[in-house]
Structures are given as structure tokens and as C-alpha cells.
């Protein structure tokens, strides 16, 4: 919501960025430089051109935080119930002025009869390439808070929750198996791993997590700078994700590990493609 109201809100505090020592406390990336899901959520929220949903009024907007006008855009918003039945879809053509917030639509979720539902947002350029995407899993009823002065005096550092939102239906998501492959992409001065991943099932693949490991030891290779991670794939949806790494481990020992909330864990070989082919 801050992006939508950036000139009205008082600001955003990020706590905390990383751990100065091995710890289980919250972070965007830990002592070992392993990024958590929050890192990729924050990265997405900071896109200069960003499509987002607002929890307070169910609005969808395009936030342009750059100093450039961007024209000939298409914003797509789709509402699914928990069973992935499409309940609403809207496609809007728009232009986004520099430093602006452009309204797309409101999500009519009042008629959803499942306790959890999903909102899928995509922003495309005139060539049909994805500029921004977002996927939300939402409760039918949001958490409620105690904003009273008495509560503030007793607990000045946090706002008490009087009722928590219920997302327990996510535990009932059907298991899925993904098609995944990985290859090394070389270019002058850099070396990347490119992952192709697809959800061939009729079910949602929720919170897909990718990692690169040493096939000999099983240890995760860190740091790896992932383009995106902890994302979700709708039925039939595919994604190409690139990761940059710097490791002395021989290529033959590299493995891609794929897992997630409701995803069968698997390990794939990393093929070598020289000279930046298929980049």
C-alpha cells in the first residue's frame, strides 16, 4: 500500500536486513548470504514499474516510481477461488506516467465462498513481454487489530492482534511434480545458471523454491543471486529464471534442487552451454 500512497504515508521501516551471526530470527538474507522469501518479496515491491494489489481496499494499481513515461501497457488481473476456478478477470490497456499511480480495477472478492483465494497480476509491454507480475494468497477475512490507546500504552512496540486471518486451507493443496531443467550460461566476465521450470499439473504449485547444491556433498552453494525465487505457478504456467554465482566447484558437481510448499522435491543435473547460448 505504501507504493500507492507514497506521498501520504509516513514511510516504511525495514527490520531487519540480515543477521550479523548465525541466527533463526527474521531477515531478508541470513549470515550465510542465503536469501529468504521476504528478500524476493521486497525486491518485487521495489520494482520501478510495479503492479500490485492493496489489502485495504482490494484495488489493483500500477506504480511507476521511475522518471520515465511508459506507454502501451496491458495490465491483467485474475481472481481464483481456492479450487482455481476463475471468478473474475480484467484486462486494461494503459499508459503509466513517470512517478505516478494508475488505477487498474478492484477485485470483487465478496462472493468468494472459500476461506482462501488467489489474485494473479501481470503487467505486459506492447510486445507481450512481462514487466511485472504478482501472485497473492488471501484470506476471506483479514486479521483485526487492537488500535486502542490502552493497548498502545501497554505494548508501545507492537499492535495486538484480536483475530488472526485463517490461511490453513493452504495445507490442503494437492501435491504437484514440476518439469525442471538447468544449464550453465557463459558470457564474458560472468557465469549464470538458467532454469526452465513448468507446472504440467492441473493444480497450483505454491512457493516454488530453487537452490543450487554441490552434488557430492549435498551442501547448498552460497551466495547465488537469483533473479526470482519462492514464486508460484498456475496450471500449465512456465518460468525461466536466471541465477548468477561464483564458485570453484566443478560444473559436473552442480545440481538444481526444486521443492516448495506442495511440491515433490527433485534434483536435476546442470547442463553446460558455452558462450552464452540461449541467453
Task: For the regions a language model picked out, list residue spans one by one.
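Carbohydrate-binding surfaces of carbohydrate-active enzymes
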Residues: 1-228, 233-243, 251-256
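Residues that form or immediately flank small-molecule/cofactor binding pockets and catalytic motifs
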Residues: 17, 263-265
